[in-house]
Design a protein with these regions (language model features):
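Glycine-rich phosphate/nucleotide-binding loop
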Residues: 1, 136-224
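Structural signal for hydrophobic packing residues in well-ordered secondary-structure cores
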Residues: 1-5, 39-42, 81-88, 96, ...
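N-terminal glycine-rich phosphate/adenylate-binding segment common to multiple enzyme folds
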Residues: 1-63, 151
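A generic local secondary-structure boundary/capping motif
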Residues: 18-28, 81-84, 133-137
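Short acidic, glycine/serine/threonine-rich loops at helix termini
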Residues: 19-22, 47-52, 103-108, 136-139, ...
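Phosphate/ribose-phosphate-bearing ligand recognition and processing surfaces
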Residues: 50, 65, 78-86, 100, ...
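Glycine-rich phosphate/diphosphate-binding loop of Rossmann-like nucleotide-binding domains
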Residues: 57-130
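Active-site rim loops that border cofactor/substrate pockets in soluble metabolic enzymes
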Residues: 106-155, 187
Protein backbone atom coordinates (compact mmCIF):
# COMPACT_ATOMS: atom_id res chain seq x y z
CA UNK A 1 0.00 0.00 0.00
CA UNK A 2 3.04 2.32 -0.27
CA UNK A 3 2.77 3.30 3.39
CA UNK A 4 6.07 5.10 3.21
CA UNK A 5 5.81 6.90 6.56
CA UNK A 6 5.96 5.09 9.87
CA UNK A 7 5.01 7.69 12.48
CA UNK A 8 5.77 6.78 16.09
CA UNK A 9 4.94 9.22 18.92
CA UNK A 10 6.75 8.96 22.25
CA UNK A 11 5.21 10.99 25.07
CA UNK A 12 5.48 10.76 28.83
CA UNK A 13 1.91 10.24 30.01
CA UNK A 14 0.36 11.04 33.42
CA UNK A 15 0.69 8.15 35.85
CA UNK A 16 3.72 6.65 34.11
CA UNK A 17 7.15 6.94 35.71
CA UNK A 18 9.93 7.56 33.21
CA UNK A 19 13.00 5.38 33.79
CA UNK A 20 15.22 8.26 32.67
CA UNK A 21 15.36 11.07 35.21
CA UNK A 22 16.67 14.61 34.92
CA UNK A 23 20.36 15.27 35.42
CA UNK A 24 19.69 16.44 38.98
CA UNK A 25 17.98 13.13 39.74
CA UNK A 26 14.44 14.51 39.89
CA UNK A 27 11.64 12.71 38.04
CA UNK A 28 10.40 13.96 34.70
CA UNK A 29 6.89 15.39 34.46
CA UNK A 30 4.11 14.32 32.08
CA UNK A 31 4.62 15.88 28.66
CA UNK A 32 8.27 16.67 29.34
CA UNK A 33 9.18 13.98 26.82
CA UNK A 34 7.17 14.54 23.65
CA UNK A 35 8.73 13.51 20.37
CA UNK A 36 7.62 12.16 17.01
CA UNK A 37 9.83 9.63 15.26
CA UNK A 38 9.42 9.53 11.48
CA UNK A 39 10.76 6.33 9.96
CA UNK A 40 11.22 5.73 6.23
CA UNK A 41 9.08 2.66 5.70
CA UNK A 42 9.49 1.23 2.19
CA UNK A 43 13.17 1.05 1.24
CA UNK A 44 16.51 1.69 2.93
CA UNK A 45 18.25 -1.12 4.75
CA UNK A 46 15.26 -3.48 4.62
CA UNK A 47 15.48 -4.31 0.94
CA UNK A 48 15.28 -7.76 -0.60
CA UNK A 49 18.25 -7.15 -2.88
CA UNK A 50 21.05 -9.56 -2.09
CA UNK A 51 21.72 -13.24 -1.79
CA UNK A 52 23.96 -16.09 -0.66
CA UNK A 53 26.70 -17.89 -2.53
CA UNK A 54 28.66 -21.03 -1.70
CA UNK A 55 26.23 -21.75 1.10
CA UNK A 56 27.53 -24.13 3.74
CA UNK A 57 31.12 -23.95 2.54
CA UNK A 58 34.14 -22.00 3.86
CA UNK A 59 33.65 -19.64 0.90
CA UNK A 60 30.09 -18.73 1.90
CA UNK A 61 29.18 -15.13 1.04
CA UNK A 62 26.08 -13.26 2.22
CA UNK A 63 25.13 -9.83 0.86
CA UNK A 64 22.17 -7.50 1.31
CA UNK A 65 21.91 -4.09 -0.30
CA UNK A 66 20.59 -0.82 1.11
CA UNK A 67 18.36 1.07 -1.30
CA UNK A 68 17.95 4.84 -1.09
CA UNK A 69 16.23 6.65 -3.94
CA UNK A 70 15.91 10.41 -4.19
CA UNK A 71 12.17 9.91 -4.55
CA UNK A 72 11.96 7.76 -1.43
CA UNK A 73 14.28 9.85 0.73
CA UNK A 74 12.83 13.21 -0.28
CA UNK A 75 9.24 12.28 0.42
CA UNK A 76 9.96 11.12 3.96
CA UNK A 77 12.08 14.21 4.61
CA UNK A 78 9.35 16.49 3.25
CA UNK A 79 6.83 14.87 5.59
CA UNK A 80 9.19 15.25 8.56
CA UNK A 81 10.02 18.88 7.82
CA UNK A 82 6.35 19.80 7.45
CA UNK A 83 5.57 17.99 10.69
CA UNK A 84 8.33 19.86 12.52
CA UNK A 85 7.14 23.13 11.01
CA UNK A 86 3.67 22.54 12.46
CA UNK A 87 4.92 22.06 16.02
CA UNK A 88 5.88 24.76 18.55
CA UNK A 89 9.57 23.83 18.78
CA UNK A 90 10.03 23.64 14.98
CA UNK A 91 12.97 21.32 15.54
CA UNK A 92 14.04 18.44 13.32
CA UNK A 93 16.77 15.92 14.13
CA UNK A 94 18.17 13.63 11.46
CA UNK A 95 19.66 10.24 12.34
CA UNK A 96 22.76 9.38 10.32
CA UNK A 97 25.96 7.35 10.34
CA UNK A 98 27.83 9.03 7.51
CA UNK A 99 31.17 8.68 9.30
CA UNK A 100 31.03 4.91 8.79
CA UNK A 101 28.43 4.06 6.16
CA UNK A 102 30.26 5.85 3.40
CA UNK A 103 27.80 5.96 0.49
CA UNK A 104 24.15 5.83 1.49
CA UNK A 105 24.27 7.92 4.67
CA UNK A 106 26.25 10.82 3.14
CA UNK A 107 23.55 10.84 0.45
CA UNK A 108 20.89 10.97 3.18
CA UNK A 109 22.72 13.93 4.77
CA UNK A 110 22.89 15.70 1.41
CA UNK A 111 19.16 15.38 0.91
CA UNK A 112 18.46 16.66 4.44
CA UNK A 113 20.63 19.73 3.81
CA UNK A 114 18.94 20.37 0.47
CA UNK A 115 15.43 19.94 1.88
CA UNK A 116 16.23 22.26 4.80
CA UNK A 117 16.58 25.18 2.39
CA UNK A 118 12.82 25.11 1.84
CA UNK A 119 12.11 25.29 5.59
CA UNK A 120 14.24 28.13 6.99
CA UNK A 121 12.06 28.38 10.11
CA UNK A 122 12.87 24.79 11.16
CA UNK A 123 15.93 24.21 13.32
CA UNK A 124 17.83 21.22 11.92
CA UNK A 125 20.51 19.10 13.53
CA UNK A 126 21.92 15.65 12.91
CA UNK A 127 23.51 13.01 15.10
CA UNK A 128 25.20 9.74 14.32
CA UNK A 129 22.95 6.91 15.43
CA UNK A 130 25.26 5.70 18.20
CA UNK A 131 25.43 9.02 20.06
CA UNK A 132 21.80 9.72 19.16
CA UNK A 133 20.67 6.70 21.15
CA UNK A 134 22.74 7.97 24.08
CA UNK A 135 21.08 11.38 23.84
CA UNK A 136 17.64 9.74 23.79
CA UNK A 137 18.44 8.33 27.23
CA UNK A 138 20.33 11.32 28.66
CA UNK A 139 18.14 14.18 27.40
CA UNK A 140 14.96 12.92 25.72
CA UNK A 141 13.28 16.29 26.29
CA UNK A 142 15.66 17.81 23.71
CA UNK A 143 13.96 16.08 20.79
CA UNK A 144 10.89 17.13 18.84
CA UNK A 145 10.69 15.46 15.41
CA UNK A 146 13.30 12.83 14.57
CA UNK A 147 13.62 11.51 11.01
CA UNK A 148 15.49 8.34 10.18
CA UNK A 149 16.08 5.63 7.62
CA UNK A 150 14.23 2.35 7.88
CA UNK A 151 16.74 0.59 10.16
CA UNK A 152 17.63 3.58 12.33
CA UNK A 153 13.96 4.49 12.64
CA UNK A 154 13.17 0.96 13.72
CA UNK A 155 15.69 1.23 16.55
CA UNK A 156 14.69 4.72 17.68
CA UNK A 157 10.95 4.04 17.58
CA UNK A 158 11.39 1.40 20.28
CA UNK A 159 13.92 3.34 22.34
CA UNK A 160 11.85 6.54 22.38
CA UNK A 161 8.74 5.01 23.98
CA UNK A 162 10.95 2.99 26.35
CA UNK A 163 12.33 6.29 27.65
CA UNK A 164 8.76 7.29 28.54
CA UNK A 165 8.34 4.27 30.79
CA UNK A 166 6.69 1.65 28.59
CA UNK A 167 6.50 0.63 24.96
CA UNK A 168 3.18 -1.08 25.69
CA UNK A 169 1.05 2.05 25.26
CA UNK A 170 2.91 3.47 22.26
CA UNK A 171 0.90 3.93 19.05
CA UNK A 172 2.00 3.58 15.45
CA UNK A 173 0.78 4.85 12.10
CA UNK A 174 1.86 3.49 8.72
CA UNK A 175 0.87 6.35 6.47
CA UNK A 176 0.33 6.93 2.80
CA UNK A 177 0.26 10.74 2.96
CA UNK A 178 -0.65 11.02 -0.72
CA UNK A 179 -3.85 9.13 0.17
CA UNK A 180 -3.66 7.03 -2.97
CA UNK A 181 -3.56 3.90 -0.80
CA UNK A 182 -4.96 2.99 2.64
CA UNK A 183 -3.05 3.82 5.81
CA UNK A 184 -2.75 1.56 8.85
CA UNK A 185 -2.97 2.45 12.54
CA UNK A 186 -2.06 -0.06 15.24
CA UNK A 187 -0.28 -0.45 18.58
CA UNK A 188 2.67 -2.47 17.32
CA UNK A 189 4.72 -3.33 20.36
CA UNK A 190 3.64 -6.93 20.77
CA UNK A 191 1.02 -8.66 22.85
CA UNK A 192 0.77 -9.95 26.41
CA UNK A 193 -0.98 -13.34 26.25
CA UNK A 194 -0.02 -13.97 29.89
CA UNK A 195 -2.65 -11.43 31.03
CA UNK A 196 -5.37 -12.38 28.53
CA UNK A 197 -8.86 -12.45 30.03
CA UNK A 198 -7.88 -10.66 33.23
CA UNK A 199 -9.24 -7.26 32.27
CA UNK A 200 -5.99 -5.48 33.11
CA UNK A 201 -4.54 -4.76 29.66
CA UNK A 202 -3.87 -1.06 29.13
CA UNK A 203 -5.97 0.24 26.21
CA UNK A 204 -4.07 3.53 25.79
CA UNK A 205 -2.09 2.31 22.77
CA UNK A 206 -5.25 1.31 20.90
CA UNK A 207 -7.09 4.50 21.85
CA UNK A 208 -4.11 6.63 20.82
CA UNK A 209 -3.97 4.88 17.45
CA UNK A 210 -7.65 5.59 16.95
CA UNK A 211 -7.05 9.26 17.72
CA UNK A 212 -4.21 9.38 15.19
CA UNK A 213 -6.49 7.81 12.59
CA UNK A 214 -9.22 10.38 13.22
CA UNK A 215 -6.70 13.20 12.90
CA UNK A 216 -5.34 11.79 9.64
CA UNK A 217 -8.87 11.48 8.24
CA UNK A 218 -9.62 15.10 9.10
CA UNK A 219 -11.84 14.58 12.15
CA UNK A 220 -9.88 16.90 14.42
CA UNK A 221 -12.70 17.50 16.90
CA UNK A 222 -13.15 13.76 17.39
CA UNK A 223 -9.38 13.39 17.78
CA UNK A 224 -9.29 16.08 20.47
CA UNK A 225 -12.17 14.46 22.33
Amino acid sequence: FDQYINLRPARLMPGVIAPVVRRDGSPRLPGEIDMLIVRENTEGEYSSIGGRMYEGTPREIVMQETVMSRYGVDRVLKFAFELAQSRPKKHLTSATKSNGIAITMPYWDERVAEMAKAYPDVKVDKFHIDILTAHFVQRPDFFDVVVASNLFGDILSDLGPACTGTIGIAPSANLNPSRTMPSLFEPVHGSAPDIAGQGIANPIGQIWCGAMMLDFLGYRAAHDA
